[in-house]
Amino acid sequence: MNNNIINLVAAIILSLSIIFGWQYFVVKPEQKKQQQQIAVQKAENLKKQQLKALVEPATGIVVQEESQIQRIKIESESLTGSISLKGLRFDDLILKKYKQDLSKNSPEVRLFSPSNTENAYFAEIGLVSNLSSVKLPNNDTIWNSDSEILSPEKPVHLFWVNEDGVKFLVTITVDENYLFTIEQTIVNYSDKELPVQSYGLINRKYIAVEKAVNILHQGPIGCIDENLKEYSYDDIKDKKSEKFAASKVDWIGITDKYWLSSLIPDKSSNYSSNFNYALKQGTERYQVDFISPVQIIKPGENFSIKSRIFAGAKKVDLLDKYEKQYDIKLFDRAIDFGWFYIITKPVFYAMNFFYGYVGNFGVSILIVTVIIKLLMFTLANKSYRSMKKMKNLQPEIDRIKNLYSDDKARLNQEIMALYKKEKVNPVAGCLPILVQIPVFFSIYKVLYVTIEMRQTPFYGWIKDLSAPDPTTIFNLFGLLPFSPPSFLMIGAWPILMAITMFLQQKMSPEPADPMQAQVMKFMPLIFLFMFSSFPVGLLIYWSWNNILSIIQQYYINKFN
């Protein structure tokens, strides 16, 4: 039985080593390579733009041909940009509250860009018909507008009339965050029946994304028939298309680590939806779209349908709010909380709750760690006692092993009888470790995928809890004027984590098995290198958790 425990602990350590080793030695170098490629690509694109002098002053990237098209300016607390009156396309959107990086002059994050720009990314809501004779607004239609500015206080009303006298009306509203509501109305003044279908699409030119194997999802996503559908860019590229016929579509879209663009169709009917890939003129494009059933509008009648577009930051409370307000199933799952969703989201709520009082997510992590420790104190106490008893029983266990070395069945019976007699649970020593594994991964997920943690400072030199510790001992934490390679970026917090881990081991009962004891001695050093590239918020949690464990073990040693 003792061997089983050792094997269990070894398996846990090995699993963690493989997961984090993959992250450190495979994913991180790949990320760096891709980031370099992206930087080179951006530099080349900028050079081309400068040579052609096609930059539009208003948005900084819209080419000159686009600047001739009339636009409706978007202005809210969270967004700026414009909507093209040609084709009524949402293709110019900037997130005002978020910078691309921490540098002083960093530009704001751009989400949508016109179709003929380098990072084309846009959304449309419109109408189609199964009859070619029906004249509907299309991508070349120039809409008439009653206003030049769209804001939360001022909706925009647009209209267009075809040659048969059919009037098309569109009302666009935007809230103070990232949600657009588009209501389309068709008034059939003609003498013919009008078959129409409402559609929505999001189209994106493929750009290299941050690799995060088994860490988070990036790419097409949606809730169809109340099931979450996630497809990577590679999945859709291989399949070319993933179709869903006559389904309940709550939402579909394209997600990045922190940003989401999503279509939210009217709930009045089912929709056909598609996740598509296309290669046109050497350019890779991905598209998600939906289309409604045919609606027949008789002469003299009118028809209205309402759809929504979400385009912005994946804030937890905001997605929760929209999910409840508009009954959008699984909208919060656009944030990839991972396998431990039922733990990860409550952990975030706890951190966010204390952040509301202390104003610092780093301090919030410390408070949540204390609460978790208090909840697990009784279990840790029992675990410590069990480990102590197991060590005291080791000589007797060795005697039984020697006595019944040729009879494994009898050997196990005798060892189990000894455990029962001494009232020892051999698994109890592992329980705190097993319980903390999902908590650890949950905190890691919260730090890695939630926008609330992005560029969030702690104290001192820590300006971003979601990024690695920027210091390193190999240049004396910045005193020496050179930057070591990435694998030598071992900062103050990783070192503190390793030191506290070593001290905790010294205060814990040493494993009875000599080999296991030797392995455990090297774990602080292994974890020092392994976790140096992880979010510093995770290292703050682990270091603080180790310090609390040391205090806890001191208390148990003194009073037991």
From Swiss-Prot:
The chain crosses the membrane at residues 5-25, 334-354, 357-377, 431-451, 476-496, 522-542. GO terms for biological process: protein insertion into membrane; protein transport. GO terms for cellular component: plasma membrane. HAMAP family: YidC_type1 (MF_01810). It is found in: Cell inner membrane. PANTHER family: CYTOCHROME C OXIDASE ASSEMBLY PROTEIN COX18, MITOCHONDRIAL (PTHR12428:SF65), OXA1 (PTHR12428). Gene3D superfamilies: 2.70.98.90. Keywords: Cell inner membrane, Cell membrane, Chaperone, Membrane, Protein transport, Transmembrane, Transmembrane helix, Transport. GO terms for molecular function: membrane insertase activity. Required for the insertion and/or proper folding and/or complex formation of integral membrane proteins into the membrane. Involved in integration of membrane proteins that insert both dependently and independently of the Sec translocase complex, as well as at least some lipoproteins. Aids folding of multispanning membrane proteins. Belongs to the OXA1/ALB3/YidC family. Type 1 subfamily. It is a multi-pass membrane protein. InterPro entries: Membr_insert_YidC, Membr_insert_YidC_N, YidC/ALB3/OXA1/COX18, YidC/Oxa/ALB_C, YidC_ALB_C, YidC_periplasmic_sf. This is Membrane protein insertase YidC. It comes from the Bacteria. It comes from Rickettsia massiliae (strain Mtu5). The gene is yidC. The keyword Coiled coil does not apply. Interacts with the Sec translocase complex via SecD. Specifically interacts with transmembrane segments of nascent integral membrane proteins during membrane integration.
